[in-house]
């Protein structure tokens, strides 16, 4: 979110170089040619990748599988819980505040290694207690880095009476990643059930 604003910040402060940004529901932005996500630059990049891999005798599918084999199989999902009315809004706020004030130490067998609070602009290292700023715009979002490349992100929807739980895992195969994703999803929902 707010990718163009982050590009401008990098350009005006001289800190950082923007390469790529994305939003899970609305695409990606490659380079600084535009200030918002568009299909044109994404399509151009995909065509460039297809041409590159064709010269190597590979399809995009082959390249994707090679990346999975090299870096791991990543799977992510989202669970949204609808809570309408004044009571629903209060429950969403309560869940966010409960998580903000009581960072989980473990979810689904994964140890929480760091906790990011974008509303408070903090990243806390759970092992050392060290806190540093996120450096990103303020937003009511909590993000937990877990062991083994897993993660959880929680935020209220900006357009609907829902709270959303995003989560992801890294596996050694597609089957392993799917099993881990299902297990972490069940653990996230069990954690939420305790707060309902």
Which stretches of residues belong to each language-model region?
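C-terminal charged capping/lid subdomain of soluble metabolic enzymes
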Residues: 160-168
């Amino acid at each position: 979110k707010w990718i163009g604003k982050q590009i401008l910040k990098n350009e005006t402060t001289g800190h950082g170089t923007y390469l790529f940004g994305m939003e899970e529901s609305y695409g990606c932005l490659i380079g600084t040619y535009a200030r918002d996500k568009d299909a044109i630059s994404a399509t151009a990049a995909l065509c460039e990748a297809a041409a590159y891999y064709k010269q190597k005798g590979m399809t995009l599918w082959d390249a994707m599988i090679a990346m999975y084999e090299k870096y791991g199989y990543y799977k992510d999902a989202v669970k949204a819980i609808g809570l309408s009315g004044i009571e629903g809004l209060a429950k969403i706020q309560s869940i966010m505040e409960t998580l903000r004030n009581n960072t989980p130490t473990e979810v689904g067998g994964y140890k929480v290694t760091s906790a990011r609070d974008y509303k408070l602009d903090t990243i806390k290292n759970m092992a050392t207690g060290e806190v540093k700023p996120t450096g990103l715009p303020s937003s009511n979002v909590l993000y937990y880095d877990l062991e083994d490349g897993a993660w959880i992100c929680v935020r209220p929807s900006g357009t609907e009476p829902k709270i959303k739980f995003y989560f992801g895992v890294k596996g050694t195969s597609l089957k392993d990643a799917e099993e881990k994703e299902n297990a972490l999803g069940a653990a996230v929902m069990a954690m939420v059930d305790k707060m309902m």
